[in-house]
Amino acid sequence: MTHGFSHPVATSRLLLQAALTVAAMLLTFAANSYQISAAPSPDKTVVDFHAYYVAGTLGLEGRAGDGYDIEKMEVAQQTYTGVKVFMPWTYPPPFTLFVTALAALPLGLAYGLFVGLTLAFYILALKRIAGAYLPGVVIAMLPVILLTVMTGQNGFLTGGLIGMFLLALMQRRASAGIPLGLMVIKPHLAVGIALLSLVERRWQAMFVAAVIVIAALALPTIVFGMSIWTAFLDGVRESSAFLAQGKYPLFRMTSVYATARSTGLSPDIAFAVHGAGALLALAFLLYGWMRKLPPHLLAASVCAATLFVSPYNYDYDLCILGVGLAFVLPGLIERTRAIEQCALLALFWAGTGYGLVTAFVQAPEIVGVGKDPLSLMAPPLLLLIALVALALRREVRARASGTSPLSPVPAL
């Protein structure tokens, strides 16, 4: 995407290089430390990638189904790490098959390859969308990028897939079905893009996605057997109960449910509030589609809506927010003053970095609703999206009057 204006900070290659250098240094340090401390130890720092590696190791041992049983998974995690942690495994079997292959490598190497390659994929997707404004996107998303590097989570992968899907969809390519199908690893994050494919009647892309999903479901069935699906469904039911009981770290979740539940509302009421919010988010998306929003605004709307569909959304899933920002940053900068840009950046960092900062400052134990810190990520994120939408209304009006220097985007 090319644009007829520039911004010294948002297009600064020096800032981009500095941010990515910090991420690379953190990645290298973590990979080395995880490899050096691979032996079980009660003093070990355990992150999300350890859960990937333990689930994959169980798969290598022919016990993939045990990963979905919380009691067996906790025993395995303590055996392999030396630390008793609460990290239920609820990923679909296709991702279990993936981490099984990953676990064939040494821990540090597996972590380094997974995080390094998915980060590169994510940055590539952002670059293709934002163009010269990539530095601004990376600066705004720095808390999420550093968090995802440290934890070894898959936010870069899902964010990159959604970004590549939206690019291919805007170019009317059937290959949009490839990233759509690969989102089978986290189907709750694919609701928005699947809905967009459906209303746009992109049948070829949906056919490609269906073929990929069928293959992705068949492979773990062949490798692990049909029993893997029974174990998976049992694990999902169990994790739903854990979510209702408040056993997950709600303060690191971005959903409306997490905020409502952490304030003391009952699970049923919190789920009802979240469900209403999710329907409203999808309704706004459909409204934007019916009003024929410009493609880049519609793409950003999909990303925003996706963040509020599932009650089980963590801070590392906010990589999707970066994709949405990449689509609108040029217009946002053009239609906002410097003071507004600083305020929006502060809100970006507050909304995306709250869980990370809280974990470091308070180091809370996961002991249940009412004892953990409040989940305060959804409110600033909703405010951020609302403020960006208001600013972008100025862009829409300017485009309609023919005064915007933004180059046209291919129609959906």
Language-model-derived ranges and their functions:
Residues 1-176, 197-322, 329, 371, ...:
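Primarily membrane-embedded glycan-assembly and transfer machineries that use lipid-linked glycans
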Residues 95, 191-192:
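Residue-level signal for cytosolic alpha-helical hairpin/rod architecture
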Residues 190-191, 317:
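Short, well-ordered alpha-helical microsegments
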